[in-house]
Amino acid sequence: MEVLPGTTVGIRVSDGVVLAAEKRVSYGLYLMSKSGKKVYRILDKMGMASAGLMADMQTLARIVEAEMRLYELDSNISPKVWTVAKLLSYILYERRLFPYYAEIVVGGLDEEGSHLYSLDPIGAIIEDDYVALGSGTQLAISIVESNYKKDMSLDEALSLALKSVYAAMKRDAASGDGVDVLVIGKSGTLEKTYPLSELQSVAV
């Protein structure tokens, strides 16, 4: 299967999860936009991020958010992170002959703790402590793998995610133009965009 454009990183620590993705939208050699959003908040303590085609990312995010909010209303309980990942797996596998061009990472907090899952375009699920997806994977994962510690803080995980995506942006032509992050912790959830000018001082 072809490598999907962009760079997305997810990191899990005991206190929560960090999802990060750069903002460049490219089709082949053409730069479509410098302000694409590839990180999505699904529920208060859950989110997803993706690499691939923007239309497919947005479609999947809308479907999952709608289904999970209906689940909350119908059952009066908050879904587990695994529930979100499994729903995405069903959706992706159902379209395996004409797949969505998206690799996805799902992360969040539930009553069992923090969780991080990666899914390929046809729905295989892998749970891990960290993951990198997209065309900048090799550059990003080398940074994460060299610096990740199970006992690191959420702030340290955020710094590592920014550093890894920024490293990919400097060498991968399909990645660039800033980073969106979703930080999901026990004390709350933070969504923030880091422009290039800020990244140069933060991702060190």
From Swiss-Prot:
SUPFAM superfamilies on file: N-terminal nucleophile aminohydrolases (Ntn hydrolases)
Chemical reaction(s) catalysed: Cleavage of peptide bonds with very broad specificity
Keyword Protease in annotation: yes
Residues annotated as the enzyme's active site: 7
Keyword Hydrolase: yes
The enzyme's E.C. designation: 3.4.25.1
GO biological process: proteasomal protein catabolic process
Keywords on record: Autocatalytic cleavage, Cytoplasm, Hydrolase, Protease, Proteasome, Threonine protease, Zymogen
Protein localization: Cytoplasm
InterPro entries attached to this UniProt entry: Ntn_hydrolases_N, Pept_T1A_Psome_bsu_arc, Pept_T1A_subB, Proteasome_bsu_CS, Proteasome_sua/b, Proteasome_suB-type
MF annotations from Gene Ontology: threonine-type endopeptidase activity
Enzyme class: hydrolase
GO cellular component: cytoplasm; proteasome core complex, beta-subunit complex
Reported regulation of activity: The formation of the proteasomal ATPase PAN-20S proteasome complex, via the docking of the C-termini of PAN into the intersubunit pockets in the alpha-rings, triggers opening of the gate for substrate entry. Interconversion between the open-gate and close-gate conformations leads to a dynamic regulation of the 20S proteasome proteolysis activity.
Propeptide: 1-6
HAMAP family: Proteasome_B_A
Family: Belongs to the peptidase T1B family.
Subunit structure: The 20S proteasome core is composed of 14 alpha and 14 beta subunits that assemble into four stacked heptameric rings, resulting in a barrel-shaped structure. The two inner rings, each composed of seven catalytic beta subunits, are sandwiched by two outer rings, each composed of seven alpha subunits. The catalytic chamber with the active sites is on the inside of the barrel. Has a gated structure, the ends of the cylinder being occluded by the N-termini of the alpha-subunits. Is capped at one or both ends by the proteasome regulatory ATPase, PAN.
Function: Component of the proteasome core, a large protease complex with broad specificity involved in protein degradation.
Name used for this protein in its record: Proteasome subunit beta 2
